[in-house]
Each structure stands twice: as C-alpha cells, then as structure tokens.
C-alpha cells in the first residue's frame, strides 16, 4: 500500500468530493469505509469509471487522504487516473461524482466512459 497525505497528490481528491464522501460515510455509520475509484472495461468508449465504498485497503492500493477520508485506487486503475480530478458536483443537472481525466483521449456524451 502506498499512502499520500495532503501533499501534491497524483490524483486530486477535491474538497467537495471528500466532504460529500465524509457525509455519506457518517450516514453509513462505519468509519472504516473508504471510497474506491476504479476503471472497468465497458461503456461506449472502452473504459468506464466506477465508485464503491470499501473497508479493505489492498496491498497495491494508492491511498489519498483528505479531510479524514480515504480515496483508494488500485494500481491498474491508477495508471489511467494520474493527474485526474475526483470531484463532486451539485448543480442544476443534479448531484453526482465526476472525474476530469486529462489522460482520456475521447469521452462519451454522458462522460462516464472514455478511451486512452
């Protein structure tokens, strides 16, 4: 496990995302939870982003901590997410987590899948 604590992170876990995750974890009542962000095959562009709560930190996970909340990224997904922003938006389109990824060459219209 590699851990990065509030320095210049290879993945930007934004303030709004970390505070929303903190709120959701408090609602779950399980402080051992972390937010896992990972890449899976699929979607109209080849890869898609996925989010899940996880209470297990794996040996190959990159751990980014902000506001007492852990963001977990496995080593395979990490290579595609270096330089990305993991953010939370609450606007007229709704409330949702979003990834802005400078490594994505193309993205689908909904923004949930991409290619490199």
Curated annotation (Swiss-Prot):
Keywords: Iron, Iron-sulfur, Metal-binding. Its cofactor is iron-sulfur cluster. Pfam families: Fe-S_biosyn. Binds 1 iron-sulfur cluster per subunit. InterPro entries: FeS_biogenesis, FeS_cluster_insertion, FeS_cluster_insertion_CS, FeS_cluster_insertion_RrpA, HesB-like_dom_sf. It comes from the Bacteria. Disulfide bonds: none annotated. GO terms for molecular function: 2 iron, 2 sulfur cluster binding; 4 iron, 4 sulfur cluster binding; iron ion binding. Iron-sulfur cluster binds at residues 44, 108, 110. GO terms for biological process: iron-sulfur cluster assembly. Signal peptide: none annotated. NCBIfam families: iron-sulfur cluster assembly accessory protein, PRK13623.1. Required for insertion of 4Fe-4S clusters for at least IspG. Homodimer. Belongs to the HesB/IscA family. This is Iron-sulfur cluster insertion protein ErpA. It comes from Francisella philomiragia subsp. philomiragia (strain ATCC 25017 / CCUG 19701 / FSC 153 / O#319-036).
């Amino acid at each position: 496990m590699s851990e990065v604590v509030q320095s210049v992170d290879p993945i930007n876990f934004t303030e709004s995302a970390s505070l929303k995750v903190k709120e959701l974890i408090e609602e779950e009542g399980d402080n051992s939870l972390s937010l896992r962000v990972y890449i899976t095959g699929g979607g109209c562009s080849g890869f898609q982003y996925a989010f899940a709560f996880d209470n297990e930190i794996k040996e190959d996970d990159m751990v980014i901590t902000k506001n007492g909340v852990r963001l977990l990224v496995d080593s395979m997904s990490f290579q595609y997410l270096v330089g990305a922003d993991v953010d939370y938006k609450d606007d007229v389109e709704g409330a949702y987590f979003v990834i802005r990824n400078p490594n994505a060459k193309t993205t689908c219209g909904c923004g949930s899948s991409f290619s490199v």
